[in-house]
């Protein structure tokens, strides 16, 4: 199991060892509880942010090796990070801090919630 922050700023290379950029965010399918892909902050200032789906990932270790990039799809984690988490009794539990992800299947296994300072 790994956290979202383990992927943040990870270097990405294609199958020909060309440097593509770094991981900027993850794309999630919250209803199915899976990571769909990663948004990439490109190495070149002339390229827009790009995206790689989990199907195009060859390997993940210290760096990420990919086959190709594609169009973005899904919900970005940064859009929901620090969102208030409320239980069924409408009691505030805290804010969403991080996700726990299975590094082989890219399933979201849990959420880290910070209670903050009250």
Label for each model-derived stretch:
Residues 1-118:
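Peripheral interaction segments used for macromolecular assembly
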């Amino acid at each position: 199991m790994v956290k979202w922050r383990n992927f943040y700023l990870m270097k990405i290379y294609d199958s020909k060892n060309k440097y593509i950029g770094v991981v900027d965010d993850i794309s999630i399918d919250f209803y199915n509880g899976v990571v769909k892909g990663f948004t990439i902050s490109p190495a070149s200032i002339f390229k827009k942010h790009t995206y790689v789906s989990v199907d195009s990932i060859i390997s993940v270790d210290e760096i990420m090796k990919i086959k190709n990039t594609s169009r973005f799809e899904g919900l970005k984690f940064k859009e929901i990070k620090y969102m208030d988490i409320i239980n069924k009794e409408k009691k505030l539990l805290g804010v969403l801090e991080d996700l726990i992800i299975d590094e082989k299947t890219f399933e979201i296994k849990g959420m880290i919630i910070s209670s903050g300072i009250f």
